[in-house]
Swiss-Prot record:
ATP binds at G153, G154, A155, G156, V157, G158, K159, T160. It comes from Lactiplantibacillus plantarum (strain ATCC BAA-793 / NCIMB 8826 / WCFS1) (Lactobacillus plantarum). Its EC number is 7.1.2.2. It comes from the Bacteria. Coiled coil: none annotated. SUPFAM superfamilies: C-terminal domain of alpha and beta subunits of F1 ATP synthase, N-terminal domain of alpha and beta subunits of F1 ATP synthase, P-loop containing nucleoside triphosphate hydrolases. The gene is atpD. Gene3D superfamilies: 2.40.10.170, Bovine Mitochondrial F1-atpase, Atp Synthase Beta Chain, Chain D, domain 3, P-loop containing nucleotide triphosphate hydrolases. One of its GO terms (cellular component) is plasma membrane. It is a peripheral membrane protein. F-type ATPases have 2 components, CF(1) - the catalytic core - and CF(0) - the membrane proton channel. CF(1) has five subunits: alpha(3), beta(3), gamma(1), delta(1), epsilon(1). CF(0) has three main subunits: a(1), b(2) and c(9-12). The alpha and beta chains form an alternating ring which encloses part of the gamma chain. CF(1) is attached to CF(0) by a central stalk formed by the gamma and epsilon chains, while a peripheral stalk is formed by the delta and b chains. The keyword Cell membrane applies. This is ATP synthase subunit beta.
Length: 467
């Protein structure tokens, strides 16, 4: 392989010169810089400047680098371990373990992080709903197998618990695998998530990849590809349905923006990199269903200054199939999961995909909840007595629906003391249909809180009467 030397260091960007007689490394190749203390630094080729010089982005800090240091071309892009051995482990962008466990040997199976998206003839053409067992999602904003879902929510509204429950349900009901990718988020949150997942028993079905806030932009820019590469192996080689969590997709864009100017590119709108749409597309197009399996991605989306026209979230939205919005006002009412039934949406909520009955029940639930929201101002000012009999019935059913959208989670059993519930989609539709028909108008509202199926509501109501 070719050998060169460091000629310039500008923050996370390193220029490397090779002899004109040697073969220049390809774009996206990984180069290894030999540092003075027997340590090494991996950099990735981004540009060829001419005269044997390439411009690279460092995957770790460039402290201690100096001109003249030896650089070796590895001959390929960054490669990371793949396969069942990755489950239960935590990796960095280079596929090195960071959980204190044993390292992967040189004979471990590895794949390059830069790969082409599946070809058209490999894709599955059918749109299939992925059952999660979570009522509010399955009924009102169903996930598409191999789709991309945006998860919106502030701090403390239950994003982490919802993620854990999805990982648990996919593992238990679908024998599925999950890959969690922490992109540019707080190290403390990543640490907490690791120990919470260990305690709740879902870690054994999960591979975790972290490139957190304190790491150089090169690592944050590529760590999403590392997680995706691990997920693709489970899909393509083992025929699995994989859940890929990316938290936070905005940080992927932000990291690219940080190095773009240093690479010599002229900034585009709002200072973002001119290659924003291309970089996002290369990542998102690899997340899809093939005839072998699927990668379904749930991406936390940070919206800077709540500006949805900002190029970063706007570019992300173009790829999303569904959105799950978590609402703080629901947590204040003790409704978990705190998914906003009116703000959340999905392209799969279509009679040709979910069926006519599911579609009719879902739209009627949304209509009743929307009418209840409109009546709340009147109720708060004038009271319930000013409503017509029809409006009183609508309010009563809407409150029962709102409470019935909640349920106990398996991963929260240790905290709530209540057993979790997985609700099949047919039971979900049956329950809401019967509430809308008025079959349970005589049952107390509290019987609908934090239960699974509609039969559980009836049982809970009986026990409340007995007590």
């Amino acid at each position: 392989m070719s050998t060169g030397k460091v000629v310039q260091v500008i923050g996370p960007v390193v220029d490397v010169e090779f002899s004109l007689n040697d073969k220049l490394p390809d774009i996206n190749n990984a180069l290894i810089i030999q540092k003075d203390n027997d340590d090494t630094l991996t950099v990735e080729v981004s540009l060829e400047l001419g005269d044997g010089v390439v411009r690279t982005v460092a995957m770790d800090g460039t402290d201690g680098l100096r001109r003249g240091m030896t650089v070796e071309d590895t001959g390929s892009s960054i490669t990371v371990p793949v396969g069942k051995e990755t489950l239960g482990r935590v990796f960095n962008v280079l596929g090195e373990t960071i959980d204190g466990g044993p390292e992967f040997g040189p004979d471990a199976e590895r794949n390059p992080i830069h790969r082409d998206a599946p070809k058209y003839d490999e894709l599955t053409t059918s749109t299939e709903v992925l059952e999660t067992g979570i009522k509010v999602i399955d009924l009102l904003a169903p996930y598409v197998r191999g789709g991309k879902i945006g998860l919106f929510g502030g701090a403390g509204v239950g994003k982490t618990v919802l993620i854990q429950e999805l990982i648990h349900n996919i593992a238990q009901e679908h024998n599925g695998i999950s890959v969690f990718t922490g992109v540019g988020e707080r190290t403390r949150e990543g640490n907490d998530l690791y120990f919470e997942m260990k305690a709740s028993g879902v870690l054994k079905n999960t591979a975790m990849v972290y490139g957190q806030m304190n790491e150089p932009p090169g690592a944050r820019m590529r760590v999403a590809l590392t997680g995706l590469t691990i997920a693709e192996y489970f899909r393509d080689v083992q025929g699995q349905d994989v859940l890929l969590f990316i938290d936070n997709i905005f940080r992927f864009t932000q990291a690219g923006s940080e190095v773009s100017a240093l690479l010599g590119r002229i900034p585009s709108a709002v200072g973002y990199q001119p290659t924003l749409a291309t970089e996002m597309g290369q990542l998102q197009e690899r997340i899809t269903s093939t005839k072998k399996g699927s990668v379904t991605s749930i991406q936390a989306v940070y919206v800077p200054a709540d500006d949805y026209t900002d190029p970063a979230p706007a570019t992300t939205f173009a790829h999303l199939d569904a959105t799950t919005n978590l609402e703080r006002s629901l947590t204040e009412q003790g409704i978990y999961p705190a998914v906003d039934p009116l703000a959340s949406s999905s392209i799969a909520l279509d009679p040709s995909i979910v069926g006519e009955e599911h579609y009719q029940v879902a739209t009627e639930v949304q209509r009743v909840l929307q009418r209840y929201r409109e009546l709340q101002d009147i109720i708060s000012i004038l009271g319930m007595d000013e409503l017509s009999d029809e409006e009183k019935t609508t309010v009563a059913r809407a409150r029962r629906i709102q409470f019935f959208l909640s349920q106990n989670f398996f991963v929260a059993e240790n905290f709530t003391g209540q057993p979790g519930s997985y609700v099949p989609i047919n039971d979900t539709i049956k329950g809401f249909k019967e509430i809308l028909e008025g079959k349970y108008d005589d049952l107390p509202e509290d019987a609908f809180r934090q239960v699974g199926k509609i039969d559980d509501v009836v049982e809970k109501a009986k026990s409340m009467v007995t007590d």
